[in-house]
C-alpha cells in the first residue's frame, strides 16, 4: 500500500498533486465538478493544463461525458510539442496549444527572421491538410507565454 502521508506530485511540484485518474471515484468527482460549472455558470469548455501527460482513456471519457452534458462543449489541451493529432481528434480534444508556432512567430518577428515564420507556417499547413478540419482549431499562439 504506500505511504499514507505521501503523494505523487507533478514534476516534483508538491503544490500540484497528481490525481489518480485510474480511480473511478476520482474521475466521477471531476465529471461532477464540470457538471456543476455547466449547470450553474453555463461554461462552454475547459482548458486542460499539461494535457500531454494525461491518460488518453481519461480524455476519451471526458470528451464523451462533456459532450453528453452540453453537445458543443469545448475541450482544449496544453500540449507543448509533439504530434498534435494524437490529442486533437473526434474522440479526445477539440484543440491544443501550439507553442511551436508561437516560438516561430515570436522569435522570427523579434529577430526579423521571416524565413523562420514562413517555414513553420508552411510546415503546419502541410500537416493541416492531412488533418482538416480538426487541426484548424489548434491555437495558433500559445497561452500563458510572456
List each model region and its residues.
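Aromatic- and acidic-residue-enriched carbohydrate-binding clefts of CAZyme catalytic domains
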Residues: 1-21, 35
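Active-site-proximal helices and loops of the catalytic beta/alpha 8
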Residues: 33-35, 39, 49-131
